[in-house]
């Protein structure tokens, strides 16, 4: 079970940008492999991914420095350690880096190693990754939050909000939920096509048409839900990722950044009122980053207004970090945390954030990034932690479907023990 060799390499993600892949070799011959995702809209408090900044290679986005850190710094430090000591290994990685933001080794280097170690350990014990991470009390299949219309930084569509998602909450199992989502996705394609709108897809596999703002996006989705034969609000609900940090400046939520002259400029109170209006008008049950990461007062106001009605998910606000989550719990900001493994940089710290959230009555949503790979680790993490919810894109692009297909396999493996669902706020 000893780690014999750790090898890092540069591969490409779903956007054609370099990322880190790591192989952890055990003395017995077993190998664990993990690839690291990357985000487009990032919270300013996220752990730092190390990029080469060499404009002559990959427009400065190469990761050879991070790979070198894996091969020349991390490998000699971890060789000989037991692969089953995940917490000790992650602690060693944090000590080796020595910075709060993981800017020395790079969060991409550290995460690749951390996840590959877990995969090698699961393979050594001959058990599924979700079982290794979560133990015997692992049985909840997540409700998929499917990003079928992309806006904001994830597309060229003139919509400020970044993601419009469907949640098949009325399904009896994950398999049926996935089918419902796929049928709505195809119905939406026809709705857009019939309007003469583009059906090209964005980074996360959702459509990126030139719609007339937020309400048009939501109403197009509702039309597709009904066309697919489902009841909005009963079978399928709507979730949004506003990514408000992307257009918040000097106390103003400036929609013109993405929507041009037709966009509005809203004060903090007006932003809260607008989101409250949308929730009253449409079957929305989850809002992510409705307020900016730097607008803690706005978050408090939004939680007072909507916290007992919908799930208010902190992504940029919490960045999968117990320090920021602790503040959010104390100040009553939000009621849910988005979990992105590369925001914090190790598996142990990720699990600590999920545990803290659940302990204080928060829900958690396991999430991909806009720059993904064929790696399916987050599917196993979602089941391992019984989070009951996963964000991993739309119903297109293999980098997204890989996670959904892994969840189908896990549900089949769990058999009658599998439960589909999430904790309602």
UniProtKB/Swiss-Prot annotation:
It comes from the Bacteria. Pathway: Carbohydrate degradation; glycolysis; pyruvate from D-glyceraldehyde 3-phosphate: step 4/5. (2R)-2-phosphoglycerate binds at residues 162, 340, 369-370, 391. The active site is at 204 (proton donor), 340 (proton acceptor). Mg(2+) binds at residues 241, 288, 315. Its cofactor is Mg(2+). One of its GO terms (cellular component) is extracellular region. PROSITE patterns: ENOLASE (PS00164). Its EC number is 4.2.1.11. CDD domains: enolase. Its main location: cytoplasm. Binds a second Mg(2+) ion via substrate during catalysis. Catalyzes the reversible conversion of 2-phosphoglycerate (2-PG) into phosphoenolpyruvate (PEP). It is essential for the degradation of carbohydrates via glycolysis. Belongs to the enolase family. This is Enolase. The lineage of its organism: Bacteria, Pseudomonadati, Bacteroidota, Bacteroidia, Bacteroidales. The gene is eno.
């Amino acid at each position: 079970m000893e780690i014999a060799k750790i090898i890092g390499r540069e591969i490409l993600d779903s956007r054609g940008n370099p990322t880190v892949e790591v192989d952890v070799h055990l003395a017995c011959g077993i190998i664990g492999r993990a690839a690291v995702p990357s985000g487009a809209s990032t919270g300013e408090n996220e752990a730092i991914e190390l990029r080469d900044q060499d404009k002559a290679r990959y427009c400065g986005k190469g990761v050879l420095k991070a790979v070198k850190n894996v091969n020349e710094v991390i490998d000699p430090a971890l060789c000989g350690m037991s692969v089953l000591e995940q917490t000790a290994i992650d602690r060693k990685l944090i000590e080796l880096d020595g910075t709060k933001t993981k800017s020395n080794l790079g969060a991409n280097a550290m995460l690749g190693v951390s996840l590959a170690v877990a995969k090698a350990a699961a393979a050594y014990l001959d058990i599924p990754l979700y079982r290794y991470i979560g133990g015997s009390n692992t049985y909840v299949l997540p409700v998929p939050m499917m990003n079928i219309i992309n806006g904001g930084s994830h597309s060229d569509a003139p919509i400020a909000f970044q993601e419009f998602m469907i949640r098949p909450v009325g399904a009896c199992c994950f398999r049926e939920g996935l089918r419902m989502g796929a049928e709505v996705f195809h119905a939406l394609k026809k709705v857009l096509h019939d309007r003469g709108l583009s059906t090209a897809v964005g980074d996360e596999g959702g459509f990126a048409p030139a719609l007339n703002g937020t309400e048009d996006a939501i109403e197009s989705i509702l039309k597709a839900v009904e066309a697919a034969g489902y009841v909005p609000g009963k079978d399928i609900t709507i979730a949004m990722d506003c990514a408000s940090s992307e257009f918040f400046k000097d106390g103003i939520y400036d929609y013109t950044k993405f929507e041009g002259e037709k966009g509005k400029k809203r004060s903090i109170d007006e932003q809260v009122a607008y989101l409250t209006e949308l929730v009253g008008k449409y079957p929305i049950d989850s809002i992510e980053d409705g307020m900016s990461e730097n607008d803690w007062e706005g978050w408090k106001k939004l939680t007072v207004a909507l916290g007992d009605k919908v799930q208010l998910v902190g992504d940029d606000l919490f960045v999968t970090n117990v320090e920021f989550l602790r503040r959010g719990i104390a100040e009553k900001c939000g009621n849910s945390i988005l979990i992105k493994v590369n925001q914090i940089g190790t598996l142990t710290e990720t699990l600590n954030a999920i545990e803290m959230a659940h302990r204080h009555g928060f829900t958690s949503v396991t999430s991909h990034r806009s720059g993904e790979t064929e790696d399916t680790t987050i599917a196993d993490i979602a089941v391992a932690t019984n989070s009951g919810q996963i964000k991993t894109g739309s119903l297109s692009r293999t980098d997204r479907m890989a996670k959904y297909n892994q969840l189908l396999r896990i549900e089949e493996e769990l058999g009658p023990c599998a439960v589909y669902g999430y904790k309602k706020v």
